[in-house]
């Protein structure tokens, strides 16, 4: 059974709903995005996570920004920018958070950099942002899952990018992903999660067979 992260939540009721439906992680975006939350909003959202684990998503944060987010009590920091292995290690020791690094995948070569991040705790394999995009993630674009054929993950990992309730079972079967992450695929209006889609995604992922 694959684990599920619902990313880009902004509304406490939706956070509670996703957690009740069985989301393992709920993600909050602290970067420019239609899904961005403030520190004050995140403090309120954290009250609704139930049994789900909250993940703070940041893009090239400064020390002060990362420390302010970590101080809210997030156990996991997902880095979605151009953070180097050294910066990821630095942010880990600075915040005390587990670090997940997002890796943009377009070709098999992109997987090579993963070995240069020995200090991180997890990986999120996501599609690269479309040409000209100024936002680092949440574009609803998938990469070619066959790139992962024969790849052995050195860390716990999640598959992301363009997943939907309709394709998540196929994605898990094709890649063997132990976890999946979704943002746009559970929205009907950009930036607003939809209960029916959140429920359908979690059910489809949890019911799926890993190869
Ligand atoms: O979701 C955002 O708005 C976002 C903004 C800036 C950096 C990262 C962002 N999201 C990162 C995620 O973990 C998304 O869930 C991931 O990119 C997959 O998104 P989608 O293809 O929309 O499901």
Swiss-Prot record:
Keywords: Amino-acid biosynthesis, Aromatic amino acid biosynthesis, Isomerase, Tryptophan biosynthesis. It comes from the Bacteria. The keyword Transferase does not apply. Its EC number is 5.3.1.24. InterPro entries: Aldolase_TIM, PRAI_dom, RibuloseP-bd_barrel, TrpF_fam. The keyword Transmembrane does not apply. One of its GO terms (molecular function) is phosphoribosylanthranilate isomerase activity. Transmembrane segments: none annotated. Pfam families: PRAI (PF00697). Pathway: Amino-acid biosynthesis; L-tryptophan biosynthesis; L-tryptophan from chorismate: step 3/5. GO terms for biological process: L-tryptophan biosynthetic process. It catalyses: N-(5-phospho-beta-D-ribosyl)anthranilate = 1-(2-carboxyphenylamino)-1-deoxy-D-ribulose 5-phosphate. Belongs to the TrpF family. PANTHER family: N-(5'-PHOSPHORIBOSYL)ANTHRANILATE ISOMERASE. This is N-(5'-phosphoribosyl)anthranilate isomerase. It comes from Hyphomonas neptunium (strain ATCC 15444). The lineage of its organism: Bacteria, Pseudomonadati, Pseudomonadota, Alphaproteobacteria, Hyphomonadales. The gene is trpF.
């Amino acid at each position: 059974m694959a684990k599920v992260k619902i990313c880009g939540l902004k509304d406490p009721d939706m956070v509670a709903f996703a957690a009740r439906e069985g989301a393992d992680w709920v993600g909050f975006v602290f970067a420019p995005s239609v899904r961005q939350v403030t520190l004050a909003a995140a403090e309120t959202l954290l009250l609704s996570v139930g049994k789900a684990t909250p993940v703070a998503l940041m893009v090239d944060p400064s020390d002060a920004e990362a420390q302010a987010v970590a101080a809210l009590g997030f156990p996991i920091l997902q880095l979605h920018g151009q953070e180097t292995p050294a910066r990821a290690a630095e942010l880990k020791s600075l915040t005390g958070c587990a670090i997940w690094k997002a890796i943009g995948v377009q070709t098999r070569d992109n997987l090579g950099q993963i070995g240069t991040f020995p200090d991180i705790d997890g990986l999120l394999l996501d599609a690269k942002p479309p040409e000209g995009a100024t936002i680092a993630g949440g574009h609803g674009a998938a990469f070619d899952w066959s790139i992962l054929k024969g790849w052995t993950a050195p860390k716990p990992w999640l598959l992301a990018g363009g997943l939907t309730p309709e394709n998540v079972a196929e994605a898990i079967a094709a890649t063997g992903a132990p976890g999946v992450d979704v943002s746009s695929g559970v929205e009907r209006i950009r930036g607003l999660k939809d209960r029916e889609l959140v429920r359908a995604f979690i059910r489809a992922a949890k019911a799926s067979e890993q190869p």
